[in-house]
Amino acid sequence: MELGVPLPRRPVPGSYGVPFVSAVRDRLDFYYLQGQDKYFESRAERYGSTVVRINVPPGPFMARDPRVVALLDAKSFPVLFDVAKVEKRDVFTGTFMPSTSLTGGYRVCAYLDPSEPNHAKIKQLLLSLLVSRKDAFVPVFRSNFGALLDTVESQLASGGGKSDFTALNDATSFEFIGEAYFGVRPSASSSLGTGGPTKAALWLLWQLAPLTTLGLPMIIEDPLLHTLPLPPFLISSDYKALYAYFAAAASQALDAAEGLGLSREEACHNLLFATVFNSYGGFKLLLPQILSRVAQAGEKLHERLAAEIRSAVADAGGNVTLAALEKMELTRSVVWEALRLDPPVRFQYGRAKADLEIESHDASFAIKKGEMLFGYQPCATRDPRVFGATAREFVGDRFVGEEGRKLLQYVYWSNGRETENPSVDNKQCPGKNLVVLVGRLLLVELFLRYDTFTAEAGKKVVITGVTKASTSAVNRTA
């Protein structure tokens, strides 16, 4: 479409099919018969549009109404970030909402629209916590993940020749987040001990089961996970144990919450949710994905990363500092590229606050007030109209240089553009900058130790070999 030429206006194509029956059939396509990417791509192809009416899971009986207008390109997708146009009340998980029994009876911040009074208070609490703990992130990460890599080396040397990074990361990320945010390792808590990651994973599953597949046979898994909610009482003891840790470890943050006008109880449930669901749930997915992508990219990228990382650390006197990290342009680009291809949260939702117009690359569409808008992020962030012929490929240096940085506005993983920042007035992830920092720190730890490494990627990421660094540019600290 030429610049300045109005886009043709079209009705939104697509079909919701026969009530109930089509929604169930579409759910089976989504999880078992087609898979997520093919589910959306096939419907965009069928109707010749990247804005299309479809059903989304979980459907009956979990969701009252599975009908959405799907936004499947980089141009239409960002309307979901505009809280002047879309309402974000109770749409964090989409067309269904988990029971508030799983969050202490509270609608936590993720489910609040910015227009609701407590949204600003809770988000300010989260933003302030991150600022207050900023000096802890680098040393605490290095301590925890340095120990993880020690374990990797031990397991590789033990004769098996493999080390399950995914499993190690599940345990290490939980320890790291608790210590980084609150100064107290969860494993030191009498309520959790070493069982924290398991309790957290169960609590996450109880909320995300309708959007999850565990690899069980369809005839068993679909009615078990996608039809009716899992009973909250089955994990109430696990949640109480998690809550007890936060009530004790986060005492300073809870004091600050009272100063913002929040009760300690509501603040504690929100800190638990933000830490376990948002941060831990995100790192469980993201860090293995970064490792997998970099392993598959091969030795040439490894050489470039090692050279950049070691040079920046050497210039900082052998220390890993925030200033040194800012000099690592390729390292940061690799993290952004992993987030572009494999966003930890793939779905975004919003309900139209009024009649509005949405534009794709090719047409304009009228949306009625109250319609549910849905974005499948991988379609948007792999849009070939923006990222060209390599849109589906991992290109580590994609965001290097002035031209590369222009593409950052199309990186949406944080529920906002990468060029924007979270505030109390929007729904962008409060930990946006921390996530990119942690991704870089993982690469720094890897390439200060190793010249290269190999890994197998499937449902788990398994490290199969490491080549120790031939030179060292860092004075490693505990």
Curated annotation (Swiss-Prot):
The keyword Lipid metabolism applies. (13S)-hydroperoxy-(9Z,11E,15Z)-octadecatrienoate binds at N278. Its EC number is 4.2.1.92. Keywords: Fatty acid biosynthesis, Fatty acid metabolism, Heme, Iron, Lipid biosynthesis, Lipid metabolism, Lyase, Metal-binding, Oxylipin biosynthesis. It is an enzyme of class 4 (lyase). One of its GO terms (molecular function) is oxidoreductase activity, acting on paired donors, with incorporation or reduction of molecular oxygen. One of its GO terms (biological process) is fatty acid biosynthetic process. It holds the Pfam family p450. Heme b binds at K88, H119, K123, K427, C429. Induction: By jasmonic acid, salicylic acid, hydrogen peroxide, copper and by the protein phosphatases cantharidin, endothall and okadaic acid in light-grown seedling leaves. By incompatible rice blast fungus M.grisea. Not induced by red (R) light or abrasion in dark-grown seedlings. Weakly expressed in roots, shoots, leaves and flowers. The keyword Membrane does not apply. Its cofactor is heme b. Pathway: Lipid metabolism; oxylipin biosynthesis. Involved in the biosynthesis of jasmonic acid, a growth regulator that is implicated also as a signaling molecule in plant defense. Converts 13-hydroperoxylinolenic acid to 12,13-epoxylinolenic acid. Belongs to the cytochrome P450 family. This is Allene oxide synthase 2. It comes from Oryza sativa subsp. japonica.
